[in-house]
Amino acid sequence: MPGFGVMVHYLPDKQSIAQVKNFDVEAFASGLAQMRASHLILTLGQNNGQYISPNSALEVLCPGAARNRPPRDLPLEIGEALRARGIALILYLPFRAPQADPALMKCLGDVSEQEPPPARFIAAWSSVIRDWSERYGPLAKGWWFDGTYNTQGISAAGWETLCDAARSGAANRWLAFNAGEGQARFSLKSAPCQNLMAGEYMQPPAHFAPPPSELVFHVLTPLTPSWGREAAPRFTAQQLRDWIGEARVARGLFTLDMPLDNNGRFLPAHVALVKSATARKP
């Protein structure tokens, strides 16, 4: 799936998760198709402890999580809508337990992400990842794990457990592990099973020089000044067109993080800009 894709930071909290009922999946998927996206990176959750998808393993490990089960399986609906349009779904998840939810951190056996992850946590988190991997099966073409800052002490067996969980249900997934932003980190290999650069680059250079790597080339940057922020675009259509073209030449991916409104719709001005950038030349 080389070429252009979109990332969204859709992150309802425990107080707003009921609003997921209003998310317009068809409008969302149609917006991606209009922009000619080949893939989507979708957040399952981040650090507030709320997820947009049910997870049986999480509820076994942390029974209190059942109280915050979402009212619909949004990633499943999105995945099916994307499959109908030939767009690949990549799931986003932090590499560590939600750092702003002490209760979930405790029952999952995790500590601060600035410290090495305990073996108990790796086992628990792997079971959570496996549950989602098997729930979505071939609908999920990949995983993008954020915050892979400290992997010190993870044993070979621990990595094998986590990597097997990420591949469960579809063995040929893209797997990216994000160790940080910028030229020094966007292309790092942070896990034995990683096959895709995480790609995070807040200020991409005018032209890419893909570093020698066994990983598939990838650059990920927000269209606006910050992730998921509703604001004016930072880039012109020509800049986007050039980056997308260079990623294709490298047989890689260029992903643009784009904000959504409360109903899951892209901002019209952003859609128009990206459509211009991805338009096929006559």
Give the residues covered by each predicted segment.
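Mature catalytic domains of secreted/periplasmic carbohydrate-active enzymes
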Residues: 1-282
